[in-house]
Structures are given as structure tokens and as C-alpha cells.
Design a protein with these regions (language model features):
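C-terminal catalytic/substrate-binding lobe primarily of soluble NAD(P)-dependent oxidoreductases
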Residues: 127-239
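N-terminal Rossmann-like NAD(P) cofactor-binding module of classical short-chain dehydrogenase/reductase
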Residues: 58-62, 83-85
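Rossmann-fold NAD(P)-binding glycine/threonine-rich loop
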Residues: 87-109
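NAD(P)-binding Rossmann-fold cofactor-contacting core
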Residues: 23-36
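Conserved N-terminal Rossmann-fold NAD(P)-binding element of oxidoreductases
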Residues: 3-7
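Conserved Rossmann-fold cofactor-binding substructure of NAD(P)-dependent oxidoreductases
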Residues: 45-56
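ADP-ribose/adenylate-binding Rossmann-like module
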Residues: 75-93
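Hydrophobic/small residue at the entry helix of a nucleotide-binding pocket
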Residues: 11
């Protein structure tokens, strides 16, 4: 199987390295990368030349920043290329569902940790249980705090900012609502780590429109975890 990885950042490079252990992998990026057993092609994926190149692959993994995600996913579907997508695009990727079906494409959107792995875990839980409320709490924390932010972006910094500014969809008392990102701050105390905070973020869009059993769950919310005080600092920065 020939796989194209679109975007060779921290996450894209890791995915490429892991997949290269079993498959033929090529990374498309705007700079040359040195990855073992992985070919890198320096190319602007928004150009026509890319559309000719991508036809030679069985599947693509879209690891581009969110602002590029929807356009590239749309292009892949039009070219009948199946895709796993981890880009945090602001657009509703489900609008491309009909075209993907028509073109016999398999598309797995929002396939990161959360959304992504969290969706799979919840799918497994609700298959055998009646659930009243689900709260997803997820976040990447640096081992060493580095004031004042006490944070290090594990993926595209642009998309980290998106987490803080994009209105968060949630389900409360059976109704889908939209809340301000960084709101509804929760305090946590995690063994071995200590006190943390969590605030609402927009990671539920595909989950809210997936398994029919989800519609029967009255309350469903996603929170992003950070060290205490982070949300307040970001709020001040945004203002």
C-alpha cells in the first residue's frame, strides 16, 4: 500500500515514521525532511501539480493545519482518494459526506486523539451501557512547567489558538448548544500530577452527528486540560 502524508510537522512526521514500518510512505511538505525510510517531496499541496501526484497513492493522511484542511479534503474526495484526516478544520467536514459516498471514498475525519480516539472509546462504552452524561477531558501537558503559560504546543500552534477561540458545541439537557471556548472551568486533582483546570473546547462536532445512540445521551461535553491559570492568561491575551 502506498500512503501519502500531507504535512510533516510533529504529528505528521511521527505518523509517517510509524507507517513506514509496514507501508511505502511519502510525506508532502513545504520543506525537506530527514525521516528514516520515508520519502519527502517538497510541494505546495494547493497547486495543480499535487493533484497529479496524489493519484498515485492508495490513501492519504491529512495532517495539515486546520485552515487548509477542508480545501484539501475536498480535493482528495474529488480525486477519489480515501483519506484519514486529523486537521482541525473550522468547516463542517460532514458536508463532504455525500460526495465521498458518490466517489466510493472512505473518509475518517477528526481522527486525532480527541476528537478521534475519544470517539472510539465512547462508541465502545455506549454499545453496552445506558449513559446519562459523558465528559471528555483531554490535553497535552509538558512534564516541566515553563511559566507563564506552562504549556508547549504538541501540534500546529495555529490550531492551538483555534481551540481557545472557536465556539464549543456541547449537548446539555438533550439540546445541542454553543458555548464560549475557555468557559465552564473545572478544577481537577490528578494523582501524580496535582491540580489542573479544564475548560470547554469544540471537539464534539462529528461525534454529535455519528452513532444514533449518541442522540439518546442527554449531556455530552468536551474539556481541554491545562495547568491552573492557563485559561485566564489566554483570555487576557485574546482581549
Amino acid at each position: 500500500m502506498k500512503i501519502a502524508i500531507l504535512g510533516g510537522g510533529m504529528v505528521g512526521s511521527f505518523i509517517a515514521t510509524e507507517l513506514s514500518k509496514e507501508y511505502t510512505v511519502t510525506v508532502y511538505d513545504n520543506m525537506k525532511l530527514k525521516l528514516k525510510n520515508v520519502k519527502t517531496i517538497v510541494m505546495d499541496v494547493t497547486q495543480k501539480e499535487f493533484q497529479e501526484k496524489i493519484k498515485n497513492y492508495d490513501i492519504a493522511v491529512n495532517c495539515l493545519p486546520g485552515f487548509m484542511g477542508f480545501k484539501i479534503l475536498k480535493t482528495l474526495i474529488e480525486l477519489k482518494i480515501s483519506c484519514i484526516d486529523i486537521s482541525f478544520m473550522p468547516e463542517n467536514c460532514l458536508k463532504l459526506s455525500k460526495k465521498a459516498i458518490e466517489n466510493d471514498c472512505i473518509v475518517i475525519p477528526d481522527a486525532g486523539v480527541a476528537p478521534g480516539l475519544s470517539n472510539l472509546i465512547i462508541g465502545n462504552i455506549i454499545s453496552n451501557n445506558d449513559i446519562e452524561e459523558i465528559r471528555i477531558m483531554v490535553g497535552g501537558l509538558p512534564k516541566e512547567k515553563n511559566p507563564p503559560w506552562n504549556y508547549k504546543a504538541p501540534f500546529s500552534p495555529i490550531d492551538v489558538i483555534e481551540e481557545y477561540t472557536r465556539p464549543a458545541r456541547a449537548k446539555i439537557n438533550g439540546k445541542i448548544v454553543v458555548r464560549k471556548a475557555l468557559s465552564d472551568i473545572q478544577e481537577l486533582d490528578v494523582e501524580g500530577i496535582g491540580k489542573l483546570e479544564a475548560f470547554l473546547t469544540d471537539g464534539l462536532r462529528t461525534l454529535l452527528n455519528s452513532d444514533p445512540k449518541i442522540s439518546k445521551i442527554p449531556n455530552l461535553l468536551e474539556y481541554t486540560i491545562r495547568y491552573p491559570g492557563h485559561a485566564s492568561l489566554i483570555e487576557k491575551l485574546i482581549k
